[in-house]
Amino acid sequence: MSNGTILDRIIERKEQEIADGKRRYSMGDLRALAENQRRARGFHRKLYDRVAEGKPAVIAEIKKASPSKGVIREDFDPVDIARRYEENGAACLSVLTDQEFFQGHEDYLRAARNAVSLPVLRKDFIVDPWQVFETRAMGADAILLIVAALSDAQMDELYHAAQQAGCDVLVEVHSAEELERAMKLNVEVVGINNRDLRTFETRLDTTLELAPQVPADHLVVTESGIHTRADVRLMRDNGIHGFLVGEAFMREEDPGAALKKLFF
């Protein structure tokens, strides 16, 4: 294992997991499993519809742990959490599937998605087209592409794999340079992560600085560091109506009630 940044270590481990996975399932196997899934729920469409209604488009995250905070929620029931989120106004769900660093699991995603009618984003570190078809095979409706973890060639390859698999894409950036790279793709939704994945430090100003550089016909989702109604108001006053929030909900006894209190 390398001694680089947290992101470097995650990607190195992910590449090992993919190599192991390919020995169990070929790309052909995953394509067949993906094609057997019911049609994906429209992740992008749900977000745009919420914003068109004048409401915040909340992607509510199901996350047990993180590298920087350790275990966030001991009492972890993804089905119960998913239902509470849906009942309290979430537009979409995000489910962590990385096991090594976030204590996630693909079974959590399957269980959560089967319990609700909301579109579900697979929150993981996608670096290989094999994972894109794996994502659809497990039932997810959208994937996350983290620009900091990918070359331009990888982004292009993964974006087109997602189109083939029938997945929507949330492209995540943290800097002006990453945003410029992301805009080379025909993306509709741009996630601006206020947390630097190399250091795990968080600044809400990251979204406020980068959002004006996103074309007006794109939807911006601010990610990480949203904890108070003042944070929400700050974003909405600046024309940002998409939110991805996890930790703020996961630390509360009732994550759904926490969502409602923060946004509605």
Language model feature labels by segment:
Residues 62, 69-170, 176-181, 207-210:
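N-terminal active-site wall of soluble small-molecule enzyme domains
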Residues 189-245:
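Catalytic-face loop-and-helix region of soluble metabolic enzyme cores
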Residues 10, 60, 85, 93, ...:
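Conserved, mostly hydrophobic/aromatic
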Residues 209-213, 236, 251-264:
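C-terminal helical cap(s) of enzyme catalytic domains, especially alpha/beta-barrels
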Residues 13, 61-65, 98, 125, ...:
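Active-site beta-loop-alpha junctions enriched in small/polar residues
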Residues 134-154, 191-200, 240-259:
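Glycine-rich phosphate-binding active-site loops on the catalytic face of alpha/beta enzymes
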Residues 2-73:
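An N-cap/entry alpha-helix motif that binds or orients negatively charged groups
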Residues 127-138, 174-185, 222, 226-245, ...:
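Catalytic cores of alpha/beta
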